[in-house]
UniProtKB/Swiss-Prot annotation:
One of its GO terms (biological process) is chorismate biosynthetic process. It is an enzyme of class 4 (lyase). FMN binds at R130, S131, S132, N251, A252, G295, K310, P311, I312, P313, T314, R336. This is Chorismate synthase. The keyword Plastid does not apply. The lineage of its organism: Bacteria, Bacillati, Bacillota, Bacilli, Bacillales. NADP(+) binds at R39, R45. One of its GO terms (cellular component) is cytosol. It catalyses: 5-O-(1-carboxyvinyl)-3-phosphoshikimate = chorismate + phosphate. One of its GO terms (molecular function) is chorismate synthase activity. Pathway: Metabolic intermediate biosynthesis; chorismate biosynthesis; chorismate from D-erythrose 4-phosphate and phosphoenolpyruvate: step 7/7. Belongs to the chorismate synthase family. Its EC number is 4.2.3.5. Reduced FMN (FMNH(2)).
């Protein structure tokens, strides 16, 4: 299973094609739209989110609410394109018409300068339109689709914000994932700690007032995963490596860890390895310091993945840059942006992880029909229970 996205930030819209999804999977489009709505929310978002009201339009691969096995195409309209039709038109522009909103002053921290150098774009808008995080709306749609597939085999995902602007949320325990999800969905910054949420929002307000931006750390948990997804036999088959690559592909993410991650540098092996036990349901671990992976394979414990997002590079008090036309020093271009997108980014990270897990399930148990996948997963769970 794989997917491709296409589209620019201020173009007509975003297209995503999912290939290799099983036939016979019932899909609720309203659930996909609900995930897209969550992505647009969160304290610190900019004015763009007041313009867009993202919803998917299915253009292939789903008939009467069920996948057919053919490539699935989603379309998400960019409502803001109305204001950018001339700037983003596909047709050649007449020579006597000035190109509007041309970008010649790259923003530090963005793809602008290096992208222009690589593809020889003298108008850096050709870079920033595609490198924009607007593309993540398409990936959230893919992830929402994959979450419905995973639900059919007993796998669920949950994401939340741990840190914003240096303010850290305290850990909490809940009786169920549903209870924890309700708390996160009710939080303006998608965190489990209400007191920390207030401090995080103050940090966001301070950054906005100063024309600055702040980043943070997001966490994703995956529950119900069977042991043995991924493989130790080749470097590129390790599932934790695939997830790490997927997370690092999300705009502005600069680091990823599983379980206690970098904290393990300060602890002896006796405190970070997870003891093995055997019971009525087969093998288990007495702890989960390693975050659900050993040797690049799932252990059956929840996957625990944390990732750090840098502050958004677009600043309303821009840093020094250089005009690529004149080579003179100027302040960087200002584009409409968020002060903090960490809450929304937690949903994007969850989405890309959902895709990697769903892809691995299909590669392990087949991807022709959903019923066959479910049957094979049930057989595998029973096999491992008595192994």
């Amino acid at each position: 299973m794989r997917y491709l996205t296409a589209g620019e930030s201020h173009g007509p819209g975003l297209t995503v094609i999912i290939e290799g999804a099983p036939a016979g999977l019932a899909i609720d489009i309203s659930q996909i739209n609900a995930e897209l709505k969550k992505r647009q929310s969160g304290y610190g978002r900019g004015r763009r989110m007041q313009i867009e009201s993202d919803q998917v339009e299915v253009r292939s691969g789903i008939r009467h609410g069920v996948t057919t096995g053919a490539p699935i195409t989603f379309w998400i309209e960019n409502k803001d394109h109305t204001h950018w039709k001339h700037v983003m038109q596909a047709e050649p522009i007449e020579s006597d018409i000035e190109v509007k909103r041309r970008v010649s002053r790259p923003r530090p921290g963005h793809a602008d300068l290096v992208g222009g150098m690589k593809y020889d774009h003298r108008d850096l808008r050709d870079v920033l339109e595609r490198s924009s995080a607007r593309e993540t709306a398409a990936r959230v749609a893919v992830g929402a689709f994959c979450k419905q597939l995973l639900q059919q085999v007993g796998v669920s995902l949950f994401s939340y914000v741990k840190v914003i602007g240096g303010e850290r949320a305290e850990s909490r325990t809940f009786d169920s994932l549903q209870e924890a999800q309700a708390v996160v969905d009710a939080s303006p910054v998608r965190t489990l700690d209400e007191a920390a949420a207030l401090r995080m929002m103050r940090r966001i307000d301070e950054a906005k007032a100063n024309g600055d931006s702040i980043g943070g750390i997001v966490c994703t948990e995956v529950h119900g995963v069977v042991p043995g997804l991924g493989s130790y036999v080749q470097y590129d088959r390790k599932l934790d490596a695939k997830i790490a690559q997927a997370v690092m592909s999300v705009n502005a993410f600069k680091g990823v860890e599983f379980g206690e991650g970098f904290e393990m540098a300060y602890r002896p092996g006796s405190e970070v390895m997870d003891p093995i036990a055997y019971g009525d349901n087969g093998y288990t671990r007495l702890s989960n310091h390693l975050g659900g992976f050993e040797g690049g394979m799932t252990t059956g414990m929840p996957i625990l993945c944390s990732a750090v997002m840098k502050p958004i590079p677009t600043l309303y008090k821009p840093l020094q840059s250089v005009d690529i036309d004149t080579k003179e020093a100027f302040l960087a271009q200002i584009e409409r942006s968020d002060s903090c997108a960490v809450p929304a980014a937690s949903l994007v990270v969850e989405a890309v992880i959902a895709f990697e897990i769903a892809k691995e399930m299909c590669e392990t148990f087949g991807h022709d029909t959903m019923e066959r996948i479910k049957h094979r997963v049930d057989e595998y769970r029973e096999e491992l229970r008595v192994w």
